A protein has these predicted regions:
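Helix-to-loop junction immediately C-terminal to a conserved catalytic motif
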Residues: 51
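Conserved ABC ATPase signature
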Residues: 134-138, 142
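Conserved catalytic motifs of ABC-family nucleotide-binding domains
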Residues: 155
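ABC ATPase "signature
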Residues: 219-220, 228
């Protein structure tokens, strides 16, 4: 099976500081991959390269076997859903308007998207009666569910999630983790998740990519990283997470 997203020798620097060393990485359709590692290790940079919010200095980013270029970047973004930590909701728009914004942006008939909105409310467990509330009138968990619906509105082939649960309290976070896992399974969604949390990565992802200082240290299942660490950093990272949990 051909990868849906592929990076070939991709690197990126910021003001002379290397954010991502030359990297080869492929993402298979229907799988959830977690990018995990300390702050500044290149996880979010990698996501922004995939969705063409950043451009590589060297190497190629491929989507569906085609190079991502300035000429086709808008089309690539239409086929990708993007969810960030704080959601990026517009405070002056209702939940409904925030979700339907993607339809308008890409020229879809909003009236035809109402059925899709109903489906997403059920899928994300968002109460329909709250659709006409503004973000300030919603809880943190509800706001993030609105952001998730917006990311899924156009039935994206790939869903990118950049620390989507990091700002939520533990109980809300746990509930959303369960819902995300169910959504990934029901939609057979190709998803790339950025997180600091090894437990979250192990729960949600089919495979984990551990990064450090702009490089991939190890790729495998949670059991691979735990039982067969490829580098001392892998064990250090996992042990630090265990210590922080108590």
């Amino acid at each position: 099976m051909q990868p849906l997203v592929e990076l070939i020798g991709v690197s990126k620097s910021f003001d002379g500081t290397i954010g991502l060393h030359p990297t080869d990485l492929a993402f298979q359709p229907g799988l959830t991959t977690a990018l995990i590692g300390p702050s500044g290790c290149g996880k979010s940079t990698l996501l922004r390269l995939i969705i063409a919010l950043l451009w590589p200095e060297k190497g190629r980013v491929l989507f569906d076997q085609k190079d991502v270029t300035e000429a086709n970047a808008q089309e690539v973004r239409r086929r990708i859903g993007y969810l960030i930590q704080e959601g990026g909701l517009f405070p002056h728009l209702t939940a409904r308007a925030n979700v339907l914004l993607m339809s308008r942006h890409f020229g879809r008939d909003v009236s035809q998207m109402q059925q899709r909105l109903d489906e997403l409310c059920a899928l994300s467990r968002f109460p329909r009666e709250a659709l006409d509330r503004y973000p300030a009138e919603l809880s943190g968990g509800q706001r993030q569910r609105v952001s998730l619906m917006r990311a899924l509105m156009l039935a994206p082939e790939v869903l990118l999630l950049d620390e989507p649960l990091g700002a939520l309290d533990p109980l809300v976070r746990s509930a959303l983790q369960r819902d995300l896992k169910e959504i990934f399974g029901r939609l057979k969604q190709t998803a790339i998740l950025v997180t600091h949390d090894m437990g979250e990565a192990a729960y949600l992802a089919d495979e984990i990519v551990l990064m450090n200082e702009g490089r991939i240290v190890q790729r495998g299942t949670a059991a691979d990283l735990r039982d067969r660490p490829a580098d001392p950093f892998v064990s250090e990272f996992i042990n630090a997470q265990r210590s922080a949990a108590f």
